[in-house]
């Protein structure tokens, strides 16, 4: 894939939306971070149905897809275990998601989701839990499971 007119924004949500869609962030409703969304065109933080994500394109072409870590492209009213899950990573082409949905989280007691299910952390900070190694471990596990279960299928995470 080649981006020939890509630019980063001063904010994470717009940059991520542009990177995942190949479009200008305002064109797909991400002119600001999700917490700053409003009804103005280009600022809704609602991924339009006509904007296909790179994950969807890859999945349609035989790739397995997963996202790990910070997402921050789900409207704030959807960020809860009850959903709706219309704008979560698993609704935008990613077959698997392990990470957090907000702008930031703590390294020691993060609010994580596996797909759309809240995650109970395997240990406390006092027992040595840290977010970054946990994300790496889950990404590695996904790659190894993918390789073992579908060795002929391509994967992207």
Locate each region found by the language model.
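Formylglycine-dependent sulfatase
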Residues: 1-157
């Amino acid at each position: 894939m080649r981006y020939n007119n890509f630019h980063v924004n001063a904010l994470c949500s717009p940059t991520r939306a542009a990177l995942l869609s190949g479009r200008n962030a305002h064109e797909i409703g991400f002119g600001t971070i999700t917490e700053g969304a409003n009804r103005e065109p280009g600022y809704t933080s609602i991924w339009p149905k006509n904007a296909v994500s790179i994950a969807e394109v890859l999945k349609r072409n035989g790739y397995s897809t997963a996202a790990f870590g910070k997402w921050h492209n789900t409207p704030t009213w959807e960020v809860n275990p009850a959903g709706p899950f219309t704008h979560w990573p698993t609704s935008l082409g990613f077959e698997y998601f392990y990470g957090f949905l907000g702008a930031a989280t703590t390294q020691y007691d993060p609010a994580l989701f596996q797909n759309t299910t809240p995650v109970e952390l395997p240990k406390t900070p006092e027992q040595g839990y840290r977010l970054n190694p946990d994300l790496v471990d889950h990404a590695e596990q996904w790659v190894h499971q993918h390789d073992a279960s579908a060795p002929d299928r391509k994967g992207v995470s």
